[in-house]
Structure formats: C-alpha cells, structure tokens
C-alpha cells in the first residue's frame, strides 16, 4: 500500500492511493498536465488509474476533471448530487454513485458527510487487508458519529487549514475570515488536534496534515499545535507530517 499526495492546499488537491493492486486518485485539483508529470515521476502512466473519487465541486478539487476523464477514462465515483451539478460540463458514462458503503476490487470505501459550503461534500474511509486510510479535508467540523467510525485507523489524512490567530490578524477580509471559521469552512490547527486526540489509536501509524493555508498557516505551527494538543490529552504520537502545495509527500508501508 502506498499514499502519494500530489499536492494539497488552496491552489489544488490530488492524492493517489495504491492499494490492493489498484490505483485510486482522490480529486483532480490541478491541470491534467501537472498531474501527469507528477505521476510520471512515480513511474505511473495516468491510464493506470482505476478509480477517481471526488470530494466536492470546488475548483481546487476538480480543476483538471474534464481533461482527466477524457484522457484517462477511469471509473468515476462521486455523490449523485455532485454528478447532477457537474453533468452539463462533464458528461461521462463510466460512473458509480457513492453510497454510504461500497466495495470495489476488494477495497471497502465508506463515505461520510462533511460540513463545507459545497453541494454534498464528503470524506472517505478506505480499507483493505486490515489497513485503513481516513481522508478528510474541507470541513468546518467533524461530528461525533463520524469520529466513532474513523477511530483507531492506520493512516489519517486530515485538514489542518489555518492558525486562528494568523487568520484573524492576516490579510483576508472579514467576510472571508468568517467563512473559513464557520461550521461550513475549514478545520483550524486546534480543532484538527482535538479531533486527532479522539481518534488516534494503537493501530495508527502516521498522520498527514492536509490543506494548509499558505497565508494563514505554516507547517511548524501546524505540527507544534497538533503535538501539543495530543500531549495535553496524554497521547504521545510524533509520526506527523504536513502535506505540501507544490511538492509530493509519499508514504509507503
């Protein structure tokens, strides 16, 4: 199993999961050319991608969708509401609507609702052979039912978008600050740490902090905040890394 985060942040998001001899791409928030170049660095032909999962319709998650579908033709898995929104722009036949739970090629994919200013935003729990990946970005909060479902998993790819103080004192106008801080906005470093303190378990191997704002955050602050909150909750876990907007982060096991 291998995770390759092509990029994560407000300018684009895409993550490749190589699991059970299948390749799953989550989101295509970069141009097809950019994703192709990154995949080729991994010695992967884009046409090897078996499945494309979409979280929601914002441009930093679907920017390269049309070109990717036309050139690669993977099975597209997405919520029906999202398909209906995108249909006119991206008519496509190889589609499977996401249910709460589905299995493809021995890979179990559990879908859960997130809270973001989008039509039907979702996160994923991907499981195979007793290994699991939780993928959560673009949400203002995580409810307790989801926390129960995703407790003690192997890998967490979870949003740590902003430092609240940097955001409030930064250049963003008040209406944009309110959007980011709202229940339909983005997770702060502090809330990311609190949620991780409730779900990290004995089976957890690594945490990757996702979707860091380049304006209202930095990796050192995000890491320090998360580790501090974990320690305050008597959890000693230091295998934490930040995803990057421009450089790939690769995790193998």
Language-model regions: role of each:
Residues 1-42, 122-138, 152-155:
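Conserved beta-strand hairpin/beta-sheet module of binuclear metal-dependent hydrolase folds
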Residues 26-29, 49-57, 77-80, 134-137, ...:
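Active-site neighborhood of phospho(di)ester-bond hydrolases with catalytic His/Asp-centered motifs
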Residues 58-62, 84-85, 118-119, 142-144, ...:
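Active-site environment of divalent metal-dependent phosphoester hydrolases
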Residues 63-72, 85-89, 217-224:
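Metal-dependent catalytic neighborhoods of phosphoester/phosphodiester hydrolases
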Residues 33-78, 154:
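Active-site metal-binding motif and surrounding structural segment of the metallo-beta-lactamase
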Residues 144-243:
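Cap/insert and terminal regions of metallo-dependent hydrolase folds
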Residues 78-131:
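Metallo-beta-lactamase
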Residues 7-8, 28-30, 57, 114-117, ...:
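Active-site metal-binding loops of divalent metal-dependent hydrolases
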